[in-house]
Amino acid sequence: IVTMLNAMSQGNDGSLSTIHANSSSEVFNRIATYAIQSHERLPQEATNLLIAGAIDFVIFLTRENRFHQGGTMRRYIASVREVNGVDNRVLSSEVFADDGTGHAQPAAPISCVNDLMEAGYDPVATYGTRRRAS
């Protein structure tokens, strides 16, 4: 995990990884647990710095069992969490959250929305009005 975080923070755009966790907020503790078990024995503080420097967003998928309704297993995005920095722990905000119906809805402003817009993100499609960070 330490090697992955180092590779992700080398300045090249675009990284993707998967990890099993029970929520988007639990991902940071899961990474820290793996890092302390690694060969490097990275302490929590150093791991948090690496996480904040390497990860921009955590996208959490969940499953909904619809077998009882004659359906199938449905996977959907339940949470999108933006990493905002570090202060003894990884600071993050849940920018999209499950609305209880299996749809992720806006939950907090995205601090890097201008960067996302430069890459093609359209906040009007999400929010109905253009929202730019100040």
Question: For each predicted feature, which ranges?
Answer:
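Conserved P-loop NTPase nucleotide-binding/switch module
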Residues: 1-60, 65-85
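NTP-binding/hydrolysis catalytic cores, primarily Walker-type P-loop NTPases
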Residues: 68-134
